[in-house]
Amino acid sequence: MNFTILIIDDEKNIREGLGTALELEGYDVKLAENGEIGLKLIEKGDIDLVITDLRMPGISGEEVIAKVTGESPGIPVIVLTGHGSIDSAVTAMRNGA
């Protein structure tokens, strides 16, 4: 069984570039362009790790983190964002990232 990583990011170049790099390392990768699609993929199962942006239209990365840690606490979450601030980092960590 392979390790499956879900990448949630509204920036296509980041999402696809990171996905390709991880696939070259032997990981199974699923891509989602927003939080809503990402949460649907998580609900289907078979996700071992989530990498999410914070600032996305619709369901934000913060909401994704809260939902994953609340409903699927065994799935670790990594935040990858260009909108870094101390407040964003603290909020993400408080939510379980």
Locate the predicted segments by residue.
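His-Asp phosphorelay/catalytic-motif detector in bacterial-type signaling
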Residues: 2, 46-48, 71-76
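Acidic catalytic/metal-coordinating carboxylates
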Residues: 3, 34-37, 60-63
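Acidic, metal-coordinating helix/loop segments flanking the phosphotransfer/catalytic sites
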Residues: 6, 31-49
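Active-site residues of response regulator receiver
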Residues: 9, 53, 81
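Two-component/phosphorelay signaling modules centered on CheY-like receiver
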Residues: 12-30
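Short amphipathic alpha-helix used as the core "switch/output" element in two-component signaling
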Residues: 40, 62-74, 91-94
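Receiver (REC) domain active-site loop signature in two-component systems and cognate sites
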Residues: 56
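Short, conserved "switch-loop" micro-motifs in signal-transduction and mechanochemical regulators
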Residues: 71, 83-84
